[in-house]
Amino acid sequence: MTRRLFTSESVTEGHPDKIADQISDGILDALLAEDPRSRVAVETLITTGQVHVAGEVTTQAYADIPSIVRRTILDIGYDSSRKGFDGASCGVSVSIGSQSADIAQGVDNAFELRTGASESALDAQGAGDQGMMFGFACSETPELMPMPIALAHRLSRRLAQVRREGVVPYLRPDGKTQVTVEYEGLRPVRLNTVLVSSQHAADVSLESLLTPDVREHVIAPEVEGLGLGLDVEDYRLLVNPTGRFEVGGPMGDAGLTGRKIIVDTYGGYARHGGGAFSGKDPSKVDRSAAYAMRWVAKNVVAAGLAERCEAQVAYAIGKAHPVSLFIETFGTETVPVERIEKAVTEVFDLRPAAIIRDLKLTRPIYSQTAAYGHFGRELPDFTWESTDRAADLKSVAGA
Protein backbone atom coordinates (compact mmCIF):
# COMPACT_ATOMS: atom_id res chain seq x y z
CA MET A 1 0.00 0.00 0.00
CA THR A 2 1.24 3.50 -0.83
CA ARG A 3 2.82 5.41 2.05
CA ARG A 4 2.42 9.19 2.25
CA LEU A 5 3.51 11.98 4.58
CA PHE A 6 1.21 14.55 6.19
CA THR A 7 2.32 17.52 8.30
CA SER A 8 0.55 19.80 10.79
CA GLU A 9 1.81 22.61 13.00
CA SER A 10 0.94 24.19 16.33
CA VAL A 11 2.14 27.31 18.12
CA THR A 12 2.52 28.27 21.76
CA GLU A 13 0.47 30.85 23.62
CA GLY A 14 3.37 33.30 23.17
CA HIS A 15 3.20 33.34 19.37
CA PRO A 16 2.19 36.88 18.29
CA ASP A 17 -0.97 35.76 16.48
CA LYS A 18 -2.01 33.70 19.51
CA ILE A 19 -1.44 36.65 21.84
CA ALA A 20 -3.91 38.57 19.67
CA ASP A 21 -6.42 35.70 19.79
CA GLN A 22 -6.17 35.49 23.58
CA ILE A 23 -6.67 39.23 24.00
CA SER A 24 -9.74 39.19 21.74
CA ASP A 25 -11.26 36.22 23.57
CA GLY A 26 -10.37 37.72 26.95
CA ILE A 27 -12.40 40.81 26.05
CA LEU A 28 -15.26 38.60 24.80
CA ASP A 29 -15.31 36.64 28.07
CA ALA A 30 -15.34 39.80 30.18
CA LEU A 31 -18.39 41.06 28.30
CA LEU A 32 -20.25 37.73 28.32
CA ALA A 33 -19.65 37.37 32.06
CA GLU A 34 -21.74 40.50 32.68
CA ASP A 35 -24.09 40.30 29.70
CA PRO A 36 -24.51 36.87 28.06
CA ARG A 37 -26.37 38.50 25.17
CA SER A 38 -23.38 40.66 24.21
CA ARG A 39 -22.67 40.98 20.50
CA VAL A 40 -18.93 41.08 20.07
CA ALA A 41 -16.52 41.21 17.14
CA VAL A 42 -13.13 42.29 18.44
CA GLU A 43 -9.85 42.25 16.52
CA THR A 44 -6.38 42.76 17.98
CA LEU A 45 -3.14 43.87 16.37
CA ILE A 46 0.05 43.57 18.40
CA THR A 47 3.44 44.86 17.32
CA THR A 48 6.61 46.19 18.91
CA GLY A 49 5.54 47.99 22.09
CA GLN A 50 1.95 48.51 20.97
CA VAL A 51 -1.46 46.82 21.04
CA HIS A 52 -4.40 48.05 18.96
CA VAL A 53 -7.91 46.75 19.69
CA ALA A 54 -10.75 47.49 17.28
CA GLY A 55 -14.16 46.13 16.44
CA GLU A 56 -17.88 46.28 17.03
CA VAL A 57 -19.62 45.62 20.35
CA THR A 58 -23.23 45.93 21.48
CA THR A 59 -23.63 45.13 25.17
CA GLN A 60 -24.93 46.20 28.57
CA ALA A 61 -21.60 45.19 30.12
CA TYR A 62 -18.40 47.11 30.77
CA ALA A 63 -14.92 45.75 30.17
CA ASP A 64 -11.67 47.48 31.12
CA ILE A 65 -10.00 46.64 27.83
CA PRO A 66 -6.51 48.06 28.54
CA SER A 67 -6.35 46.06 31.79
CA ILE A 68 -7.44 42.88 30.00
CA VAL A 69 -4.78 43.46 27.35
CA ARG A 70 -2.00 43.95 29.90
CA ARG A 71 -3.07 41.06 32.12
CA THR A 72 -3.25 38.67 29.18
CA ILE A 73 0.21 39.60 27.94
CA LEU A 74 1.77 39.36 31.39
CA ASP A 75 0.09 36.01 32.10
CA ILE A 76 1.61 34.62 28.91
CA GLY A 77 5.05 35.65 30.17
CA TYR A 78 5.92 38.83 28.29
CA ASP A 79 7.10 40.99 31.17
CA SER A 80 10.32 42.42 29.79
CA SER A 81 11.53 43.96 26.55
CA ARG A 82 14.31 41.35 26.64
CA LYS A 83 11.61 38.77 25.90
CA GLY A 84 10.18 40.77 23.02
CA PHE A 85 7.41 42.62 24.86
CA ASP A 86 6.43 44.07 28.23
CA GLY A 87 2.73 44.00 29.06
CA ALA A 88 3.20 46.49 31.87
CA SER A 89 4.62 49.29 29.73
CA CYS A 90 3.24 48.73 26.22
CA GLY A 91 0.92 51.21 24.58
CA VAL A 92 -2.75 50.22 24.21
CA SER A 93 -5.21 51.89 21.85
CA VAL A 94 -8.90 51.01 21.66
CA SER A 95 -11.36 51.78 18.86
CA ILE A 96 -14.71 50.08 19.47
CA GLY A 97 -18.01 50.89 17.75
CA SER A 98 -21.44 49.26 17.89
CA GLN A 99 -22.74 46.42 15.73
CA SER A 100 -24.28 47.48 12.43
CA ALA A 101 -28.05 47.90 12.71
CA ASP A 102 -28.41 46.12 9.37
CA ILE A 103 -26.68 43.02 10.73
CA ALA A 104 -28.48 43.23 14.07
CA GLN A 105 -31.95 43.22 12.50
CA GLY A 106 -31.22 39.93 10.74
CA VAL A 107 -29.87 38.30 13.88
CA ASP A 108 -32.62 39.57 16.19
CA ASN A 109 -35.51 39.20 13.75
CA ALA A 110 -34.82 36.31 11.40
CA PHE A 111 -36.21 35.90 7.90
CA GLU A 112 -38.52 33.09 9.06
CA LEU A 113 -40.12 35.36 11.66
CA ARG A 114 -40.33 38.44 9.43
CA THR A 115 -42.09 36.54 6.64
CA GLY A 116 -44.51 34.76 8.97
CA ALA A 117 -43.11 31.35 8.05
CA SER A 118 -42.61 30.48 11.72
CA GLU A 119 -43.39 31.73 15.20
CA SER A 120 -40.90 29.44 16.96
CA ALA A 121 -38.53 31.18 19.35
CA LEU A 122 -35.66 29.21 17.81
CA ASP A 123 -36.56 30.67 14.42
CA ALA A 124 -36.33 34.22 15.76
CA GLN A 125 -32.52 34.35 15.65
CA GLY A 126 -30.95 34.46 12.21
CA ALA A 127 -27.40 33.61 11.29
CA GLY A 128 -25.00 36.50 11.88
CA ASP A 129 -23.44 36.05 8.45
CA GLN A 130 -23.47 33.89 5.38
CA GLY A 131 -20.84 31.20 4.94
CA MET A 132 -19.96 27.54 5.24
CA MET A 133 -18.46 25.84 8.28
CA PHE A 134 -16.76 22.46 8.55
CA GLY A 135 -16.27 19.93 11.32
CA PHE A 136 -14.15 16.80 11.32
CA ALA A 137 -13.43 13.72 13.41
CA CYS A 138 -11.51 10.50 12.84
CA SER A 139 -10.49 7.44 14.81
CA GLU A 140 -6.73 8.10 14.74
CA THR A 141 -6.53 9.25 18.39
CA PRO A 142 -8.65 8.80 21.54
CA GLU A 143 -9.89 12.39 21.18
CA LEU A 144 -10.94 11.57 17.58
CA MET A 145 -8.54 14.06 16.01
CA PRO A 146 -5.97 13.64 13.23
CA MET A 147 -2.66 12.38 14.60
CA PRO A 148 -0.39 15.18 13.24
CA ILE A 149 -2.28 18.11 14.79
CA ALA A 150 -2.97 16.20 18.02
CA LEU A 151 0.73 15.52 18.54
CA ALA A 152 1.78 19.02 17.44
CA HIS A 153 -0.55 20.52 20.08
CA ARG A 154 0.82 18.19 22.76
CA LEU A 155 4.35 19.32 21.98
CA SER A 156 3.52 23.04 21.95
CA ARG A 157 1.69 22.73 25.29
CA ARG A 158 4.68 20.88 26.74
CA LEU A 159 7.06 23.52 25.37
CA ALA A 160 5.12 26.22 27.21
CA GLN A 161 4.84 24.06 30.35
CA VAL A 162 8.59 23.50 30.76
CA ARG A 163 9.14 27.24 30.32
CA ARG A 164 6.51 28.20 32.87
CA GLU A 165 7.67 25.62 35.42
CA GLY A 166 11.32 26.60 35.05
CA VAL A 167 12.38 23.15 33.87
CA VAL A 168 14.08 24.83 30.90
CA PRO A 169 14.52 28.31 32.36
CA TYR A 170 16.14 30.00 29.37
CA LEU A 171 13.12 29.49 27.09
CA ARG A 172 10.98 32.49 26.11
CA PRO A 173 7.21 32.52 25.33
CA ASP A 174 7.29 32.42 21.52
CA GLY A 175 7.43 28.97 19.97
CA LYS A 176 6.17 26.63 17.26
CA THR A 177 6.01 22.89 16.68
CA GLN A 178 5.48 20.84 13.55
CA VAL A 179 4.87 17.11 13.18
CA THR A 180 5.12 14.95 10.06
CA VAL A 181 3.41 11.55 10.19
CA GLU A 182 3.73 8.73 7.68
CA TYR A 183 0.45 7.16 6.58
CA GLU A 184 -0.28 3.79 5.05
CA GLY A 185 -3.57 4.38 3.32
CA LEU A 186 -5.69 6.15 5.93
CA ARG A 187 -3.74 4.76 8.90
CA PRO A 188 -0.91 6.66 10.65
CA VAL A 189 2.02 4.26 11.02
CA ARG A 190 5.24 6.17 11.74
CA LEU A 191 6.46 9.45 13.17
CA ASN A 192 8.68 10.91 10.45
CA THR A 193 9.80 14.39 11.58
CA VAL A 194 9.43 16.64 14.62
CA LEU A 195 10.31 20.33 14.33
CA VAL A 196 10.51 22.60 17.38
CA SER A 197 11.35 26.29 17.16
CA SER A 198 11.54 28.10 20.48
CA GLN A 199 12.54 31.59 21.44
CA HIS A 200 15.40 31.52 23.94
CA ALA A 201 17.69 33.74 25.98
CA ALA A 202 20.94 35.02 24.50
CA ASP A 203 24.08 32.87 24.41
CA VAL A 204 22.29 29.52 24.52
CA SER A 205 24.09 26.76 22.64
CA LEU A 206 21.84 25.04 20.12
CA GLU A 207 23.85 21.83 19.97
CA SER A 208 24.96 21.32 23.57
CA LEU A 209 21.98 22.73 25.49
CA LEU A 210 18.79 23.57 23.60
CA THR A 211 18.49 20.47 21.42
CA PRO A 212 19.18 17.98 24.26
CA ASP A 213 16.78 19.83 26.57
CA VAL A 214 14.01 19.89 23.96
CA ARG A 215 14.52 16.19 23.25
CA GLU A 216 14.48 15.22 26.94
CA HIS A 217 11.90 17.58 28.43
CA VAL A 218 9.54 18.38 25.56
CA ILE A 219 9.50 15.54 23.06
CA ALA A 220 10.28 12.41 25.08
CA PRO A 221 7.39 12.81 27.58
CA GLU A 222 4.88 13.19 24.74
CA VAL A 223 6.26 10.72 22.20
CA GLU A 224 7.70 7.83 24.19
CA GLY A 225 4.99 5.38 25.07
CA LEU A 226 2.53 7.20 22.82
CA GLY A 227 1.21 3.91 21.51
CA LEU A 228 -1.72 4.21 19.11
CA GLY A 229 0.15 1.88 16.76
CA LEU A 230 2.60 4.61 15.76
CA ASP A 231 6.28 3.76 15.24
CA VAL A 232 8.20 6.52 17.03
CA GLU A 233 11.71 5.12 16.55
CA ASP A 234 14.28 6.94 14.43
CA TYR A 235 12.24 10.06 13.69
CA ARG A 236 14.10 13.15 12.49
CA LEU A 237 14.37 15.99 15.03
CA LEU A 238 14.91 19.60 13.97
CA VAL A 239 15.36 22.26 16.68
CA ASN A 240 15.61 25.95 15.74
CA PRO A 241 16.89 25.23 12.24
CA THR A 242 17.65 28.93 11.65
CA GLY A 243 20.39 28.54 14.28
CA ARG A 244 19.12 31.24 16.65
CA PHE A 245 15.75 32.50 17.92
CA GLU A 246 16.50 35.30 20.38
CA VAL A 247 14.24 37.98 18.89
CA GLY A 248 10.67 36.73 19.22
CA GLY A 249 7.17 37.66 20.19
CA PRO A 250 5.70 40.90 18.80
CA MET A 251 9.21 42.34 18.47
CA GLY A 252 9.96 39.72 15.83
CA ASP A 253 6.57 39.57 14.09
CA ALA A 254 3.33 41.50 14.32
CA GLY A 255 0.37 39.45 15.54
CA LEU A 256 -3.25 39.55 14.39
CA THR A 257 -6.45 37.92 15.57
CA GLY A 258 -7.61 35.08 13.33
CA ARG A 259 -4.37 34.26 11.52
CA LYS A 260 -3.98 30.74 12.91
CA ILE A 261 -7.27 29.19 11.76
CA ILE A 262 -5.63 25.94 10.64
CA VAL A 263 -3.82 25.56 13.97
CA ASP A 264 -7.16 26.27 15.65
CA THR A 265 -8.91 23.45 13.81
CA TYR A 266 -7.53 20.27 12.19
CA GLY A 267 -4.04 21.17 11.03
CA GLY A 268 -5.03 21.21 7.37
CA TYR A 269 -6.29 17.63 7.50
CA ALA A 270 -9.88 18.75 6.89
CA ARG A 271 -11.43 21.64 4.99
CA HIS A 272 -12.02 25.06 6.52
CA GLY A 273 -14.77 27.54 5.69
CA GLY A 274 -12.42 30.50 6.14
CA GLY A 275 -13.95 32.21 9.18
CA ALA A 276 -11.83 32.77 12.28
CA PHE A 277 -13.12 32.18 15.82
CA SER A 278 -11.49 34.42 18.42
CA GLY A 279 -13.16 37.65 19.46
CA LYS A 280 -16.56 36.57 18.12
CA ASP A 281 -19.64 35.92 20.24
CA PRO A 282 -21.70 32.80 19.40
CA SER A 283 -24.24 34.64 17.26
CA LYS A 284 -21.45 34.55 14.68
CA VAL A 285 -21.88 31.19 12.96
CA ASP A 286 -18.23 31.30 11.91
CA ARG A 287 -17.61 30.17 15.46
CA SER A 288 -20.75 28.52 16.81
CA ALA A 289 -21.53 26.47 13.70
CA ALA A 290 -17.91 25.30 13.39
CA TYR A 291 -18.18 24.06 16.98
CA ALA A 292 -21.49 22.39 16.13
CA MET A 293 -19.98 20.66 13.10
CA ARG A 294 -17.17 19.24 15.25
CA TRP A 295 -19.89 18.00 17.62
CA VAL A 296 -21.73 16.37 14.71
CA ALA A 297 -18.65 14.76 13.17
CA LYS A 298 -17.34 13.48 16.49
CA ASN A 299 -20.67 11.89 17.35
CA VAL A 300 -20.86 10.20 13.93
CA VAL A 301 -17.45 8.60 14.52
CA ALA A 302 -18.19 7.80 18.18
CA ALA A 303 -21.39 6.07 17.08
CA GLY A 304 -19.38 3.79 14.81
CA LEU A 305 -21.14 5.09 11.70
CA ALA A 306 -17.80 5.94 10.07
CA GLU A 307 -14.08 5.93 10.89
CA ARG A 308 -13.77 9.50 9.66
CA CYS A 309 -16.37 12.16 9.07
CA GLU A 310 -16.35 15.67 7.67
CA ALA A 311 -19.52 17.72 8.07
CA GLN A 312 -20.34 20.98 6.28
CA VAL A 313 -23.18 23.36 7.06
CA ALA A 314 -23.98 26.64 5.29
CA TYR A 315 -26.09 29.66 6.25
CA ALA A 316 -27.61 32.78 4.73
CA ILE A 317 -27.31 35.93 6.83
CA GLY A 318 -30.54 36.64 8.68
CA LYS A 319 -32.02 33.13 8.18
CA ALA A 320 -32.32 30.66 11.04
CA HIS A 321 -32.37 27.41 9.09
CA PRO A 322 -29.20 26.25 7.32
CA VAL A 323 -29.28 26.36 3.54
CA SER A 324 -27.37 23.08 3.24
CA LEU A 325 -25.82 20.16 5.11
CA PHE A 326 -23.18 17.83 3.66
CA ILE A 327 -21.64 14.71 5.20
CA GLU A 328 -18.47 13.09 3.80
CA THR A 329 -17.11 9.81 5.21
CA PHE A 330 -14.33 9.05 2.70
CA GLY A 331 -15.48 5.48 2.13
CA THR A 332 -15.23 4.56 5.83
CA GLU A 333 -18.99 4.50 6.54
CA THR A 334 -20.67 1.44 8.05
CA VAL A 335 -24.14 2.47 6.84
CA PRO A 336 -25.05 4.45 3.70
CA VAL A 337 -24.02 8.10 3.89
CA GLU A 338 -27.59 9.16 3.07
CA ARG A 339 -28.77 7.50 6.29
CA ILE A 340 -26.05 9.23 8.28
CA GLU A 341 -27.04 12.61 6.84
CA LYS A 342 -30.71 11.98 7.56
CA ALA A 343 -29.88 10.92 11.12
CA VAL A 344 -27.85 14.09 11.65
CA THR A 345 -30.80 16.26 10.58
CA GLU A 346 -33.08 14.41 13.01
CA VAL A 347 -30.72 14.35 16.00
CA PHE A 348 -29.13 17.82 15.74
CA ASP A 349 -30.90 21.18 15.52
CA LEU A 350 -28.52 23.40 13.57
CA ARG A 351 -30.39 26.68 13.86
CA PRO A 352 -28.06 29.25 15.52
CA ALA A 353 -30.26 29.70 18.61
CA ALA A 354 -30.47 25.92 19.08
CA ILE A 355 -26.70 25.51 18.75
CA ILE A 356 -26.13 28.25 21.33
CA ARG A 357 -28.67 26.63 23.67
CA ASP A 358 -27.46 23.04 23.30
CA LEU A 359 -23.75 23.83 23.58
CA LYS A 360 -24.24 26.52 26.27
CA LEU A 361 -22.23 29.02 24.27
CA THR A 362 -23.17 32.24 26.08
CA ARG A 363 -20.84 31.38 28.98
CA PRO A 364 -17.45 33.16 29.31
CA ILE A 365 -15.45 30.11 28.21
CA TYR A 366 -13.53 31.35 25.22
CA SER A 367 -10.16 32.41 26.62
CA GLN A 368 -9.26 28.77 27.14
CA THR A 369 -10.00 28.00 23.49
CA ALA A 370 -7.61 30.64 22.16
CA ALA A 371 -4.41 28.56 22.31
CA TYR A 372 -3.64 24.89 21.58
CA GLY A 373 -6.69 24.21 19.46
CA HIS A 374 -10.45 24.62 19.76
CA PHE A 375 -10.98 20.90 19.13
CA GLY A 376 -9.68 17.68 20.62
CA ARG A 377 -9.39 18.92 24.22
CA GLU A 378 -12.02 17.24 26.35
CA LEU A 379 -12.40 19.99 28.93
CA PRO A 380 -15.66 20.44 30.88
CA ASP A 381 -16.49 23.71 29.12
CA PHE A 382 -15.84 22.31 25.62
CA THR A 383 -19.37 21.00 25.18
CA TRP A 384 -18.82 20.40 21.46
CA GLU A 385 -16.40 17.59 22.39
CA SER A 386 -19.21 15.60 24.02
CA THR A 387 -20.39 12.38 22.37
CA ASP A 388 -23.80 12.65 24.02
CA ARG A 389 -25.71 12.19 20.75
CA ALA A 390 -23.85 9.08 19.53
CA ALA A 391 -26.45 6.60 20.77
CA ASP A 392 -29.29 8.58 19.19
CA LEU A 393 -27.44 8.80 15.88
CA LYS A 394 -26.78 5.07 15.89
CA SER A 395 -30.42 4.32 16.60
CA VAL A 396 -31.83 6.67 13.96
CA ALA A 397 -29.32 5.50 11.34
CA GLY A 398 -30.28 1.89 12.01
CA ALA A 399 -26.72 0.79 12.70
From Swiss-Prot:
- What cofactor does its activity depend on? Mg(2+); K(+)
Q: Which GO terms describe its molecular function?
A: ATP binding; magnesium ion binding; methionine adenosyltransferase activity
Q: What is its main location?
A: cytoplasm
Q: Which residues bind K(+)?
A: E43
Binding-site list for ATP: H15, D174, G175, K176, R244, F245, D253, R259, K260, A276, K280
E.C. designation(s): 2.5.1.6
So, what pathway does this thing act in? Answer: Amino-acid biosynthesis; S-adenosyl-L-methionine biosynthesis; S-adenosyl-L-methionine from L-methionine: step 1/1
Q: Name one GO cellular component term.
A: cytoplasm
The UniProt record gives the binding positions of Mg(2+) as D17
Describe the subunit structure.
Homotetramer; dimer of dimers.
Q: What does the function comment of this entry state?
A: Catalyzes the formation of S-adenosylmethionine (AdoMet) from methionine and ATP. The overall synthetic reaction is composed of two sequential steps, AdoMet formation and the subsequent tripolyphosphate hydrolysis which occurs prior to release of AdoMet from the enzyme.
Q: What is this protein called?
A: S-adenosylmethionine synthase
What organism is listed for this UniProt entry? Answer: Salinispora tropica (strain ATCC BAA-916 / DSM 44818 / JCM 13857 / NBRC 105044 / CNB-440)
Q: The organism's lineage?
A: Bacteria, Bacillati, Actinomycetota, Actinomycetes, Micromonosporales
Gene assigned in the entry: metK
